[in-house]
Design a protein with these regions (language model features):
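Beta-sandwich/jelly-roll carbohydrate-recognition scaffolds of carbohydrate-active enzymes
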Residues: 1-194, 227
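Aromatic-rich carbohydrate-recognition surfaces in CAZymes
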Residues: 195-261
Length: 261
């Protein structure tokens, strides 16, 4: 079986190979152009390119596997690093390997920042402790609206929908820094920097909801929009991975800013 829990910039994966009846294999796939490296049958790190950004990762298992390597397409290799597209890394152990936990940090800045994010957000906490802390964060966020009446199904639909409003925007800040695809630089900023907003739709009602229920979050989103303007000269329409996609017409950021004010 497998379990997964997350923080904002990190995740913990628990695998149990005790009763698998075959060898234990874990694969790390780099889908687009990128690099991957394996260290000591336990650590995997690398990056893949996405539009105007790179997504870096650092992963460490709580116990070493027996063997490891990389692959290019379908060809397995014992080499400790690989680069290109369609590459990845693998770790393997005999049947009955038992339980193993991977801690994975991500970053738009570099591998070291991914490692720092992992340490800052999970530290030495056990899987269940991270899961409970994550649950508490969501309880606080969703608990700002209390529903009276309705059926269990209706309340479940409501809170599921409220949960999904947090899909956009994304806090891209990392330890007092953030990467911007607008000018392709790393900026120093101690406050949150939000990105990735499908604003041709979200300007209609999502930002109004944030203004009413999560005003501190909405203010930082608007501050981030103004920051994007300062970086490249225009307010955003649909910014993705830290750059403008030029997908939609109009100026949806203007009513968002006015509504927030």
């Amino acid at each position: 079986w497998a379990e997964w829990t997350t923080t904002e910039r990190a995740a913990l994966y628990e695998f149990d190979f005790t009763d698998a009846g075959r060898q234990a294999n874990v694969l790390f796939r780099v889908g687009s152009e990128g690099e991957v490296a394996v260290d000591g049958n336990r650590v995997v790190s690398g990056w893949e390119s996405v539009d105007y950004a790179r997504q870096y990762f650092y992963a460490v298992a709580d116990r070493p596997f027996v063997s490891s390597g990389t692959y290019d397409g379908t060809a397995l290799s014992g080499e400790c690093s690989a680069s290109g597209s369609g590459i990845g890394a693998w770790l393997s152990a005999p049947a009955g390997f038992g339980k193993v936990c991977f801690r994975v940090g991500i970053s738009y800045i570099d591998v070291e920042q991914a490692r720092a994010n992992l340490e800052a957000e999970t530290g030495g906490l056990a899987f269940d402790a991270v899961k409970e802390r994550s649950r508490a964060v969501w309880e606080e966020a969703l608990g700002r609206i209390r529903v009276k009446g309705g059926t269990d199904r209706e309340r479940r639909i409501f809170y599921t929908s409220l949960y999904r409003t947090f899909e956009r925007m994304v806090d891209q800040s990392e330890g007092g820094r953030y990467y911007s695809g607008f000018d392709r630089r790393v900026h120093e900023d101690a406050r949150p920097f939000y990105n990735d907003d499908w604003m041709w739709d979200t300007y209609r009602n999502l930002h109004q909801l944030m203004t009413l229920v999560y005003p501190e979050r909405q203010l930082e989103m608007v501050r981030s929009m103004i920051g994007m303007y300062k970086e490249w000269g225009w307010l955003p329409k649909w910014e993705l991975y830290g750059r403008e996609t030029f997908t939609m017409e109009g100026d949806p950021a203007i009513p968002v800013i006015v509504d927030t004010w």
